[in-house]
From Swiss-Prot:
Main localization (coarse): cytoplasm
Coiled-coil stretches noted in the UniProt entry, renumbered to this chain: none
Name this protein carries in UniProt: Ribosome maturation factor RimM
PRC barrel domain segment(s): 94-167
UniProt keyword annotations, A-Z: Chaperone, Cytoplasm, Ribosome biogenesis, rRNA processing
Length: 170
């Protein structure tokens, strides 16, 4: 079940004294929380389905009131739980954009056909994201800039890059 879910947030603590939880969004689209009716709270192989009563935003956090959680103690019991949703409930992205989880495991090649490795992580920086590629003998940090990433082929699970001079020497 867990592999068919994506993580969109993490409960960091309670909010107030009426059972609300404070959630750090782990998505580029925090507004997606407004569409939630139910979520799965997951930690240490424990999965709990919860209905959402109310959502509001406070600074960089999402404040969520779940059905049946009505006091601080009950809210604190969910600290450090991840909020997950089924993959089929993800938002539609513009063409040419991908969720991080979709790119993990893709093979990365240069435009000359040299295999570099597989995508193991994508680091969001607030600017240009960095694609972390694990090779057989070496790891690479590739900026996800249009000038460098020339093709992403989801059908073949392949990314083609045109490395700038020195990029692969680091």
């Amino acid at each position: 079940m867990n592999d068919k879910m994506i993580t969109i947030g993490k409960v960091t603590t309670h909010q107030g004294n009426k059972g609300e939880v404070r959630v750090l969004p782990l998505t580029d689209y925090p507004e997606r929380f407004e569409l939630l009716e139910q979520v799965f709270l997951v930690r240490d192989n424990r999965v709990i389905e919860k209905r959402v009563e109310q959502i509001r935003f406070h600074k960089k956090f999402v404040i969520i009131k779940f059905e049946g959680i009505d006091d601080i103690g009950a809210a604190l019991a969910y600290k450090d739980y991840f909020i997950k949703i089924p993959r089929e409930e993800t938002l539609d992205l513009p063409e040419g954009h991908y969720f991080i989880f979709e790119l993990l495991g893709f093979e990365v090649y240069t435009d000359e056909g040299i295999f570099l490795g597989k995508v193991v992580d994508i680091i969001t920086t607030g600017g240009t994201d960095i694609i972390k590629v694990k090779g057989d003998k070496k790891d690479y940090m590739v900026p996800a800039a249009r000038e460098i990433v020339v093709n992403i082929n989801p059908d073949e699970e392949k990314i083609i890059i045109k490395p700038i001079p020195g990029l692969l020497d680091l």
